[in-house]
Structures are given as C-alpha cells and as structure tokens.
C-alpha cells in the first residue's frame, strides 16, 4: 500500500538561497536565527525558555540539513543525533518567494513566469480596479489601499471599518489582494462573496491570490483574525503530481488546512478544515489512520508563517517548533511499511529579518519511511524534486521538472 504524508511547516527556511541577493535576503536563515536568539536567552516566553530543543527533528536529519545549507550547526540542535531519516535542502526555481509558487513547485510545477504585484506602498490599487469591485459588490467605498501588516491594519482601520461598513483592501510584497472585514458586523459570507468578485476582476493583473481576512473584536487592541481565512488562488499552469495521482491512479489527496485553497482545489479529493497547529496535527493523525492505498495526506501548518514569521515573533516561532517536535513521533508510530513522510517548507520567513515579508531561503527536505535509507540527499536544485519523487513512488507519468531522490 502506497501512502505519502507531506507536512509543510509554512515559512520554515533553513538558510539563504544562492539567489537571495535578488530579493534583499542575503544572510537570512529562519531556523538558524531562531536558534541563535534562543541560545542568547532572547526568545523566552510563557511557553518556552533557553536553547532551541528539537531532538526528534534532529534525529530525522534537520540539524544536518541546516548544516549542509549554511555551513554551521544551529545552536541547541543535537549535532550528534543518530540519524533515522533522509535529509537535504532544496533551492527554488520559481521566480517568487510566495506560498503558491513554493507549493506548486513542491508538487512538480515551478512558477517560471512573473506574478503581478502592487508595488506602490500607498494608493496601491488602480482606481479602475477598485471601482469595478465596489460597483459589483454594491459598496460605496473602501479603506486601506496600501501595503500593510495584517495585524497592524486592523488596529489602524478596524474601528472605522465597523462604523462605515467599508472593507479594508491591502497588499504586501507578495502577489496578493487582501480583504479584511469583521465577521459579525460585515458578515463572513458577504466577505467571501466580495473576495470572489475581486478574484474575477483581478484576472488581467496576474495576481496569485485574493485572501479573505475575517476578524472579530470590539475595538483597537482587541481585534483578532479568525480561522475562517480563505485563499482564492489561480490554478497551477500544468498538472501537479496531485492531479496525476487522482487522474492516472484514481488516488486520493486529502487537504488539511489551506492546501486546497493554494492549489485552487485542483487534484484535491477531500478537504479537512482545522485551525492552529494542535488542531492541524490532530487532523493529520486522524487522516493518516483513515488513508487508503494511493493516498497523499497533505497538511500546511500556516501558523509558523502567519502567527510567528510575519509578526517577527521569535519566541512564538521557537515554541511552535518545539511543540511540533514533541508530536512528530506520533506520526512515525502509525506509519506502515511502505509509507513515506516528507517534512518541508514553501519559503522562508525569518522572524529576525527587517520588515514583515518572506525570505528567499532553502527549504528542508526531510524524508522518513521504514524502507527509506537514512542519510544525506544533499542539495536539491528544485523543490520539484519532491513532486518528481512522489510521481516515481506512485507510478504516475513523470513530471517535467525535478529529479527523484529515493
């Protein structure tokens, strides 16, 4: 029975890529810099303190993968752990350092075109675009129209939004159009309808995602995003390994978290909603136990990125990694003879880096299975090596990009 479990630690980069200079990210290192801050006692909170401890991930090969990527061991990680997994680091072929590009490339389809971006920090959106969105939605105005941190924009504009009913439109360095609205005063269904309108109107702008950002709360300092985020992505430009598994092998792909949104539902046969790392982990375990032959269980742990990376919360990121490390053996314990587990990421988001954006980094490629030889996979030239490996494993037609590493 062939089953693969892909766990994406969203934003968990392990060292700057060779082309990081093109992105202003030379020297970025999500894992390494978190470990440095922990070692220096600068990443303590009510959930953790001291050096970064990831004993189980180190056994799987994380510390060695980071060493091969950067030339140094991350402090606190066990450099002498007995390795039970195959480990490597992968560079990105895709032109961007965004979520869809990373995930599509993982599934064998790198993004070799340039996304559209809204580059102006203020007055970011063309008037003709916002006019069409407002007209179709029956709205008389909007707030924002700028680059913004998703949490700061709520403090800045949330109360005015509640008073006026005007949605908050904002963007970032990514190819995104984000809409924040209060779940109770504006309405979740109404927000999702507005996002669908925006998705349609953005077709000519080549924008990767429209993101619904619902929130709740009574006023400034009390606003919180809810778990009802939706990402409306364009479809991948060619068939991913997910689609090939479903179409060629009549297999199943179980999406946990925002995976289905990222792939615009292409190649997804089941969607499981869960919010927060503990709930995502529980859902993953449940779906692994239920999975049949020719199945991929695919989970995105978005909080590493959204709650800690973008918010530059080093202690929060470290605590989340240690929580994940403390539970990963639960997956190993229920794996069957031919199963394959892949731990990876889609980009970096170094919480010590200036700004709030992603960082261009290598991603870890950590593979475990009872039939998978332990040892180094070395440097992989593309995230698409993961997709090609899955294509080989499941016996689908080969992908156009990537090399099998098993």
Curated annotation (Swiss-Prot):
Binds 2 manganese ions. It comes from the Bacteria. It is an enzyme of class 5 (isomerase). The keyword Nucleotidyltransferase does not apply. Keywords: Cytoplasm, Isomerase, Manganese, Metal-binding. Its main location: cytoplasm. Mn(2+) 1 binds at residues 10, 346-347. GO terms for cellular component: cytosol. One of its GO terms (molecular function) is magnesium ion binding. Pathway: Carbohydrate degradation; 2-deoxy-D-ribose 1-phosphate degradation; D-glyceraldehyde 3-phosphate and acetaldehyde from 2-deoxy-alpha-D-ribose 1-phosphate: step 1/2. One of its GO terms (biological process) is metabolic compound salvage. This is Phosphopentomutase. It comes from Vibrio campbellii (strain ATCC BAA-1116). The gene is deoB.
